[in-house]
């Protein structure tokens, strides 16, 4: 009876220790999963916002290029009209007695740059979609479900591992403690035996 009474606090202590570790592991898993999910979602939101902003900048620059082209056509048309009016004087520049200015059209460069930007945006979008894992792609339409699965999966794996390997580890630990207790008992008995032997001699 005494040996059993001594073992119960050890078993109770081990059970409390493993239970505490399990709950701590679950809490850590929930915290880690939630933090990783929030950080990933924030990164994806930032990436999507940058992508949208770049699209808007591209549209704005394209519209400015079209406006500049239209304005340059108006200016050139006015110049031709003024040259016709001042034809007798040798044209507008001769009438003003100034050096003539000529229009250099660089809107083709802007058009090319915008085409390259559109192409890079398209490539980034395809790359972003291809880098999404099957898990994110599967649950991309319902973020609450992704959050739930990501948060619960870590603790469930920890619990499964504890259920699989916990009994084996607990048995090994109990056996180790039993062996140590047996060694201590043997040492105590041999110590008492030596004392009795010296008293009896």
Curated annotation (Swiss-Prot):
Gene3D superfamilies: 1.10.287.210. GO terms for biological process: fusion of virus membrane with host plasma membrane; symbiont entry into host cell; virion attachment to host cell. A motif (CX6CC) lies at residues 93-101. Specific enzymatic cleavages in vivo yield mature proteins. Envelope glycoproteins are synthesized as an inactive precursor that is N-glycosylated and processed likely by host cell furin or by a furin-like protease in the Golgi to yield the mature SU and TM proteins. The cleavage site between SU and TM requires the minimal sequence [KR]-X-[KR]-R. The R-peptide is released from the C-terminus of the cytoplasmic tail of the TM protein upon particle formation as a result of proteolytic cleavage by the viral protease. Cleavage of this peptide is required for TM to become fusogenic. The keyword Transferase does not apply. Pfam families: TLV_coat. One of its GO terms (molecular function) is metal ion binding. Residues 76-92 are annotated as: Immunosuppression. GO terms for cellular component: host cell plasma membrane; membrane; viral envelope; virion membrane. Residues 170-201 are cytoplasmic. A motif (YXXL motif) lies at residues 193-196. Keywords: Cleavage on pair of basic residues, Coiled coil, Disulfide bond, Fusion of virus membrane with host cell membrane, Fusion of virus membrane with host membrane, Glycoprotein, Host cell membrane, Host membrane, Host-virus interaction, Lipoprotein, Membrane, Metal-binding, Palmitate, Transmembrane, Transmembrane helix, Viral attachment to host cell, Viral envelope protein, Viral penetration into host cytoplasm, Virion, Virus entry into host cell, Zinc. SUPFAM superfamilies: Virus ectodomain (SSF58069). PANTHER family: BC035947 PROTEIN-RELATED, VIRAL ENVELOPE PROTEIN. This is Envelope glycoprotein. It comes from Kirsten murine leukemia virus. The lineage of its organism: Viruses, Riboviria, Pararnavirae, Artverviricota, Revtraviricetes.
């Amino acid at each position: 009876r005494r040996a059993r009474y001594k073992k119960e606090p050890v078993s109770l202590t081990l059970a409390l220790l493993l239970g505490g570790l399990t709950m701590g592991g679950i809490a850590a898993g929930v915290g880690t999963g939630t933090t990783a999910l929030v950080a990933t979602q924030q990164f994806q939101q930032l990436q999507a916002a940058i992508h949208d902003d770049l699209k808007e900048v591209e549209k704005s620059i394209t519209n400015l290029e079209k406006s500049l082209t239209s304005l340059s056509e108006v200016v050139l048309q006015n110049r031709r009209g003024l040259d016709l009016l001042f034809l007798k004087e040798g044209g507008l520049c001769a009438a003003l007695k100034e050096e003539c200015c000529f229009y250099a059209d660089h809107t083709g460069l802007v058009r090319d740059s915008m085409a390259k930007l559109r192409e890079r945006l398209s490539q980034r979008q395809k790359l972003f979609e291809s880098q999404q894992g099957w898990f994110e792609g599967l649950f991309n339409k319902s973020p609450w479900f992704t959050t739930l699965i990501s948060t619960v999966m870590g603790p469930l794996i920890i619990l499964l591992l504890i259920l699989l390997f916990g009994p084996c580890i607990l048995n090994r630990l109990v056996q180790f403690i039993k062996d140590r207790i047996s060694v201590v008992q043997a040492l105590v008995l041999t110590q008492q035996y030596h004392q009795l032997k010296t008293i009896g001699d």
